[in-house]
Amino acid sequence: MKKQIARILLLISVIAGSCIEKAAAQAPNIIFIIGDDISWDDIGAYGNNKIKTPNLDKLAKDGLRFTNMYLTASSCSPSRSSILTGRYPHNTGAAELHSPLPAHLKYFPELLKQQGYFSALVGKWHEGPNTRRAYDTLLVDRKANGEGGELQWNNLLKARPKDKPFFFWLAPFDAHRPWSAKTDGPQHNPETDIAVPPTLVDTKETRQDLAFYYNEISQLDQYVGELRQELERQGIADNTLIIFTADNGRPFPGSKTRLYDAGVKTPFIVSWPAGIKAGQVCESLISSIDIAPTLLEVAGVKPAETVQGTSFATLFKSPEKAFRKYVFAEHNWHDYAAYERSVRSKDFLYIMNKRPEWDNGGPIDANQSPSAKALKAAKASGGLTVLQNDALLKPRPAEEFFDNQKDPLQTKNEVGNKAYAAQVNELRRMLKQWQDETGDTEPANLTPDWYDRETGEPTASKDKRGEMPGAARKADHIHLKGPF
């Protein structure tokens, strides 16, 4: 009897293994490219006619370009951790910069790996040691990978196992500060090849700062082109799904760590010749927590019960369909103490700031940049617009409300305008419902500033951590999705 049971169990395991191998053989390869500190409107395909991104522009032309993809945080590791888990930052247990993800959560590359994918990460990796289990291969040595982290992309593509589909998480350091002394790809003339964002002042220093930033994006762009050439050479381009996106807005005042569109709206391009018709645009509202369940569905893998996002795979075939009504985002500690929350619909944006007494000039790399110094110098002479002054404003509004259709740059706070009373109340209600359902809590002791907001010098509180948002309700164990 025991021998019969053993034979049955062996047969079941063989059949199960065979099914996984068969499913994996038919599944698409997936390449997820996540740029570092790149704004949505700093790509040619999104309307920037100064920056040189021919390969990303072609990727968009060959696939599907999303115009309303929103991150859950405009902060490096919290944003990436949110994508990896399909959860809001306060639900990951890693809502603050450089906080490691806990072991009890599932990471979507891990589920792909279990389904038979060869899983690899190249480049930036700071989501914590527990995520190591999600990858067969980690190539994170910056010296070996090159200054931007892209030198190993094609080497990995050539060396991968050829008998299974692959998932690559490609995380270049481009375009994170400090800028590389030399970059591959097209260069940008500060005088003629720059579109100065309205949040910055147009000075020689700002233009040079932006030129270095543009050069790093163009370097990344060049490697995207070389990667696609290698896919074609190997004859696997047709069934390889490529995504290009970014973790947060540009590392300049007014973008990175901000809850405006300049901070959390992100480029999102998907190319998959076998599954997506070329030359399409999707205007549906989507959250970055929706990426994990989408890629799992495409691969034929059931999402973990911990996932709060919803698959938008149907938009690959029908990009004209509506998806979300609301997207939510949060700003927690990133060099400086913070507790802000936002909810955005297609038409309106509402922001709640529990620490309005503080300014928000961005993290230290942004607020100590040449562009920030140019802003401060211009303010001293009394020459800033509303948008330019916003990064230096103190105190800030406790609430902000913008009409995205009439005011796309989000310059006029309408929270006190009676004409918008119903819309303000609706988004207030949605934000509270989201916080209640997902277990978001305001810490009694926020992680303090690690640097002086004006000088950038380390404070006495450097390296000290406070309470994580959501910790009081154990939000990392709450799986409710909140309003959709």
Describe each PLM feature range.
Residues 447-451:
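A glycine-rich phosphate-binding loop feature that marks nucleotide/adenosyl-phosphate handling sites
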Residues 403:
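A contiguous binding-surface segment within folded domains or other stable secondary-structure elements
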Residues 2-13, 20-400, 408-436, 440-446, ...:
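Formylglycine-dependent sulfatase
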